[in-house]
Structure formats: structure tokens, C-alpha cells
Amino acid sequence: EPRFETGGAVTRAEIFVYDVRHRTLAGQGPVQTTITPGQPGARFDLSALGNGEGKREPVYLHASGLEGDEAAGRLVYRGPCRMVQGRNILTAGQFELEQRGGRFSARDKVRGIFFTRDGQGKEQRFEITSERMQYDPERREIRFEDQVRTRTDQGVMSADTLDGLLREGGGLSELVARGHVRLNQPTWDATGD
């Protein structure tokens, strides 16, 4: 089975085509990448979105195809795409990983299911959907854009944009919703901008 290793990750596919002149890589057929936490270069960590749930577990990326550009340090996974770490799951039509900065983006029907803990330590399922997502681990910031919708045990919220600041070690520190914000809870509703 063809495979390549880079930056703490192992990627397998049915076929890899490497263009030496342009330094690009294409993976075809089912593509799977395994990122092992703690390995040199293994900077992406899905558990940061869910209070560190599954932090020591590998990140698995599954896609239909892969395009890599060595000079740009970028890998683009084409869909349908699925990423799993522990019980945390992220799906989208496309994933893009910047290997040098560890930044990550997803687009086209982004859906994430993350497990967090509230102030009393009670586990809570946090589901979010949007059209685009950007994650910057250096700044510990995440942004969901376009048709954002979140669902928890406490209710449903929709907005144009949702910005999150992550605590060091994982978990959300702050969420800021902007643009056509609507909050629905069992006992009341609210709207705002």
C-alpha cells in the first residue's frame, strides 16, 4: 500500500503521483492520514475544541483525494472528508492543512461534534455546522462562517460568524457570535446582532 510520511503524519492512498518538477503530490482513491500526538511536526490537534477530550489519541483524516504542494507546505483533502480524534468528529467537503504553521481550514458543509465539560465538570455534547471554518493553533483561535448553527443541551444558536478563543490545553474559553444572532432555549428566545 503506497504511503508517505511527513511532519508527524503517515498518509496512505491507493495511488500517489509525485510531480518532481513542480514538487506536488496527488493521492487518489481512499486517502487516510494518521497524525500521532507528540511526534515532531504533529501540530494539529482536534481535541483543542473539546476540553482536551481525546488529546492523547491519534487524529485520523479520511478523504477521497489529496493534493499536496511541497513549496507552499499545504495539503488539501477533497471530499467527502472526515476527521476523528477520540469521540470528536469533523466533516466537510474539503480540508486544508498548512504544514508549517499548523493552520487548518474546512469548507463546504462543515459539521463538528465535540465533547466538552461545563463549569461543574459535567460532560456536554457541542455540535456546530457552517460553510467555512478556520483554525489557528498558534493564536488559539477558531472561526466558523456562513450559516453557523450550534446545538448543545442548553439550546440552539445561529449567526453569520462565530469566533472562538481556546484555552491552553484545550477547550473553549470564549465564544463571540456576530451577525443575525438568534438564540433558542427551552424557556426563552433572543435575537441580536
Language model features by range: what are they?
Residues 1-193:
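Mature-chain termini and adjacent capping regions
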